[in-house]
A protein has these predicted regions:
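Bacterial N-terminal signal peptides
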Residues: 8-16
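Carbohydrate-recognition beta-sandwich/jelly-roll modules
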Residues: 21-264, 270, 308, 589, ...
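Active-site-proximal substrate-binding groove within the catalytic cores of carbohydrate-active enzymes
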Residues: 111, 115-116, 121-178, 185, ...
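Aromatic-lined carbohydrate-binding/catalytic grooves of carbohydrate-active enzymes
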Residues: 211-363, 375-376, 384-389, 395
Length: 602
């Protein structure tokens, strides 16, 4: 009976979809004109419909192309929600307002409305669209806005716009179904492999699943200057030592003595000039932190204690103070000017073209770093924390899609050389070649710090986690890092600033619970012995649930106000209770601000 009902619902949903299988394409021109037209969607399958906007329609006077699903209208008071790539969602409960995100960790957005549930898969220009929610007089419009003007700053439009709308029905007609759908898409096309599948090829990954990451932040670093400066050897700021290699040996011993059996140490600031100091050059080893012999002893000591230790590397940033400095490998605009972004320890930061570095020095440098003794997930900063850069240099021109391919080639080589690879955040253009990330995104922290800026946002669901749990190891958000240290005393985002390691000491049980609910694992950035006990506390919190790191997350739902049920592929279930009262599940009480694990293997 259940199967017949599900089949009926699928047929009914598809019929409804067929009756309205159009999308509105709205062209916004540079002079402010707008032209909208209804476009019939192409049948890819019974439940997948494709929108194509030919590149011939992306002429020089086009600024934006908006893509709106006609078949899922929503207004205030409707049951359901819109959902963004990270899992940020909003209920249909506002009269007016707007929300937008210019960057998406996965090229997906979705809606659940009274008439339809779907997830949209952006197949082209995934690095060039904004996610938008606009509400006027209680009517919601949720759409992708393709920034054609920005594409043209670098290249003439080189692809059609292609968006696939995936219809959901029955038990799949929710954000869990959206996540499972995109995960299936990624697995079936070979873009990613599960952890269980990869372990046979990368045994270091098996250890990593049971370990938390402690990132020594940093051994040494120059202070971040106040002004954007092209430093020289004569004008650069001095390196400040935070945890020299000899002291780091004592630090890892203290962690072992605290009773921690498995850790993956990420050594940041070991390199030439300290953290972000003189990249793209990493060698020789930072003399101020102790030099190569001391680093080798630190690595050897760490490994003898039974811990992993890997190196932090920065391949996207370069500075004029580096002995390797050359404008030849820097990404360039069409007019030949250098692509720069940000201000870090090395001064004004320029973006390295990954095509140029791959065909230049990077592959050899990976081997040279491995020769120091590092083994485990080689950490390459930034790759998964933002979009790939672009380059119009005629000698190594690359679209962001091509740049992503070179990032993946470098990560794949790192996996072969070190036994694994890692990066910073959850942007999934490199998902097939990373084992862990430091955090998925920073939206939870943003919403908590400034809720007044996001009136349309109701919260965050683990959409990304349903896609990638059991594929990539992660911590959910900047908000949930270093959580047993308390909240950061300073309102800053730059982890290269030592003040980022200062906590207020006030722990919040809701943060610990959020890590469990979202299937994450703790991570610590530190150079202080005062954090040893805090790291041990975080590790103890992780122990009861760490075996689930190898499992796929199958669903997440709110089963009562403030109570969430998470199901895993092996049959395990976790109930997380944020409410003020105990919640009864399976005839057992789940106490307030706690969780209970129901082990699927028992």
């Amino acid at each position: 009976m259940v199967k017949k009902l599900s089949a009926f619902l699928l047929i009914a949903a598809c019929c409804c979809f067929s009756m309205g299988e159009t999308a509105t394409v709205r062209t916004i021109f540079k002079d402010g004109r707008k032209i909208s037209k209804s476009v019939k969607l192409e049948d890819v399958s019974e439940s997948v419909k494709r929108l194509t906007v030919p590149k011939s329609e992306l002429s020089g006077d086009v600024r934006f192309i908006d893509v709106v699903a006609d078949f899922a209208p929503a207004k205030k008071g409707d049951d359901g929600y819109w959902i963004h790539a990270r899992g940020t969602y909003g209920k249909f409960d506002k009269d007016s307002g707007s929300y937008g995100m210019s960057r998406q960790v996965i090229p997906v957005w979705g809606m659940k409305t009274p008439s339809a549930a779907f997830w949209a898969n952006v197949r082209t220009y995934r690095f060039d669209y904004q996610f938008r929610v606009e509400v006027k007089n209680g009517n919601y419009e949720v759409f992708a806005r393709f920034d054609i003007e920005n594409v043209r700053k670098w290249f003439e439009p080189y692809n059609d716009i292609v968006v696939d709308f995936n219809l959901l029905s029955g038990e799949d007609a929710n954000y869990s179904g959206m996540g499972r759908g995109y995960r299936k898409f990624q697995l079936e096309r070979g873009a990613v492999r599960t952890i269980k599948d990869r372990i046979k090829d990368f045994p270091e990954l098996d250890y990593l699943c049971d370990a938390i990451v402690v990132r020594i932040q940093t051994h040494a670093a120059k202070p971040i200057p106040e002004k954007s400066i092209d430093f020289t050897k004569e004008t650069e700021l001095p390196v400040v030592v935070h945890m020299p290699f000899g002291v780091a040996e004592e630090f890892v011993k203290a962690l072992k003595d605290a009773g921690i059996d498995k850790l993956s140490i990420c050594s940041a600031g070991w390199n030439f000039g300290g953290y972000d100091g003189r990249t793209p050059q990493h060698l020789p080893v930072c003399a101020e932190a102790g030099g190569e012999d001391a680093l080798r002893r630190f690595i050897e000591t760490t490994q003898k204690l039974g811990f992993q230790i890997s190196a932090h590397a920065t391949l996207t940033d370069c500075y004029t103070v580096s002995p390797m400095w050359s404008p030849d490998y820097v990404g360039k605009y069409p007019d030949g000017s250098l692509d720069s972004n940000g201000l870090w320890s090395g001064g004004k930061c320029y973006r390295v073209c990954q095509k140029a570095s791959y065909n230049g020095w990077v592959l050899k440098e990976l081997e040279d770093i491995r020769a120091l003794g590092f083994k485990g997930p080689h950490y390459i900063d930034v790759y998964s924390a933002t979009y790939p850069n672009r380059c119009s240099d005629k000698n190594h021109s690359a679209t962001p899609e091509e740049m992503a391919e070179y990032q993946n080639r470098i990560l794949a080589r790192a996996k072969k050389v070190f036994g694994g690879a890692a990066s910073e955040a959850g942007f999934d253009h490199v998902a097939g070649n990373i084992d862990y990330i430091n955090y998925v995104d920073r939206v939870m922290k943003q919403y908590e710090d400034h809720p007044e800026k996001y009136p349309l946002v109701s919260g965050v669901y683990p959409l990304w986690e349903i896609v990638y749990h059991g594929i990539i190891l992660y911590n959910p958000d900047r908000l949930t890092q270093n959580h047993t240290r308390g909240r950061c005393l300073y309102k800053l985002e730059k982890s290269g600033d030592p003040r980022w390691m200062e906590g207020d000491g006030i722990t919040d049980p809701k943060i610990s619970l959020k890590i469990v609910e979202f299937g994450g694992r703790p991570i610590f950035y530190t150079y202080k012995f005062a954090d040893v006990g805090r790291i041990k506390k975080a590790y103890d919190e992780f122990l009861p649930v760490r075996r689930l790191q190898r499992e796929l997350m199958e669903s997440h739902e709110e089963i009562s106000e403030g109570v969430f049920l998470v199901k895993y592929g092996d049959g395990s279930e976790i109930v997380c209770n944020y409410s003020k009262m105990p919640f009864k599940y399976r005839n057992e009480n789940v106490e307030s601000l706690s969780y209970k694990l129901y082990d699927g293997k028992k």
